């Protein structure tokens, strides 16, 4: 249904004013940001297409979208693209700010959300490391390796060198499972143990290894696997 055909109280802006933003769907919130559609494509349809980007479905996928992804959507001109990219970047910065201002372990949920934002929608496996200071606040997130996780695909020396470069006091390991399943495999456990041993030599603690997928995450520390 086109936006103009909805009853006034059901239109996104009026609904938000009356009931608050949490009462709106993702599509409705996006429609407010976009404001208008185009001839033959209403703003609600445009918002729906943004949540169905090829290989980047849902909000987590949209948060990883770049300029080229948005340009491919018919009806998104330069102005709307710039507006959306600015909103998405602000969302990413807000999540990173939470981890920089307080210890990561004080909010494991924030860590999981942050990692899902960066990794969950990837179609290939990515291994990343959160480098933390002595108070366990975020210094940086770096993607280290791509491909199926095995002992031979993750080089402990490279992780140690990057940790020393950042003067990290601790790290959180992370990778995604494109399959959508977040169970830790034998390879995941072996890689974690190898990195723990290597980082222990330079007095850097591995606080956790988080596995993420769209809508799901697993903390190996939380499961008693570290």
UniProtKB/Swiss-Prot annotation:
GO terms for molecular function: metal ion binding; metallopeptidase activity. InterPro entries: MPN (IPR037518), RadC_JAB (IPR025657), RuvA_2-like (IPR010994), UPF0758 (IPR001405), UPF0758_CS (IPR020891), UPF0758_N (IPR046778). NCBIfam families: PRK00024.1 (NF000642), radc (TIGR00608). A motif (JAMM motif) lies at residues 175-188. This is UPF0758 protein Daci_1904. The keyword Hydrolase applies. Keywords: Hydrolase, Metal-binding, Metalloprotease, Protease, Zinc. Belongs to the UPF0758 family. The keyword Secreted does not apply. Residues 104-226 form the MPN domain. PANTHER family: DNA REPAIR PROTEIN RADC, UPF0758 PROTEIN YEES-RELATED. GO terms for biological process: proteolysis. The lineage of its organism: Bacteria, Pseudomonadati, Pseudomonadota, Betaproteobacteria, Burkholderiales.
